[in-house]
Regions:
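Short acidic/His-enriched helical or mixed secondary-structure segments at domain edges of catalytic enzymes
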Residues: 121-139
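PAPS-dependent sulfotransferase catalytic domain
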Residues: 1-91, 134-166
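Short, solvent-exposed polar/charged micro-motifs at secondary-structure junctions
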Residues: 32-36, 100-103, 127-130
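Residue-level signal for secondary-structure boundary sites
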Residues: 46-47, 99, 116
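Short, surface-exposed acidic
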Residues: 112-123
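Phosphate-binding beta-loop-alpha motif at adenosine-nucleotide cofactor sites
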Residues: 84-110
């Protein structure tokens, strides 16, 4: 299964396959003392992706200000502190797409596991498998401008620079 989402049981518990170590994807805040792979994405792209996730029913300005269940982009980074958190591999989303070979090498080393696949599945194959997680691609430059872009950059300038997005 390509999609990393886990469905909860009615009692909010999660059933994992027997004999496998769970890999849990979260958009939530940090839970210390567990190994983690933190994937950072350009916050401007993240804002637009979240806007699409919400079906454009919440304003971009509310997403920037954290007026939704995930909070502000910079608060999430603050919570995880991926550059200083122990036992954490920091990956850039954009690097995964542009240099998969290097990314797989880093993952293999961090997880102490061999590489079993060296290709990303296509968007189409993921959509065929579970289309609810594949949305229209919208470039942040097409959706985020003016006052909203200025506000986001003001709130997040330090992280945008630190991670090479400005």
């Amino acid at each position: 299964n390509y999609v990393g989402h886990i469905e909860q049981n009615e009692d909010r518990s999660i059933t994992f396959p027997s004999g496998q170590k769970p890999l849990i994807k979260t958009h939530g805040k940090n839970k210390p003392n567990s190994p983690a792979i933190y994937i950072i994405r350009d916050g401007r792209s993240t804002i637009v992706s979240l806007w699409e996730f919400y079906g454009r029913k919440i304003s971009i300005s509310d997403i920037i200000e954290g007026n939704h269940k995930f909070g502000k982009w910079n608060e999430h980074i603050n919570s995880w502190d991926p550059l200083n958190r122990q036992d954490t591999l920091l990956l850039k989303y954009e690097d995964i797409l542009s240099d998969l070979e290097t990314t797989l090498g880093e993952l293999s080393y961090f997880l102490n596991k061999g590489i079993v696949c060296d290709k990303l599945p296509s968007r189409e194959s993921i959509a065929d498998n579970d289309g609810r997680w594949v949305r229209k691609k919208t470039d942040w430059k097409d959706a985020l401008s003016g006052e909203n872009l200025d506000r986001f950059n003001t709130l997040n300038k330090a992280y945008l620079k630190q991670f090479g997005y400005l």
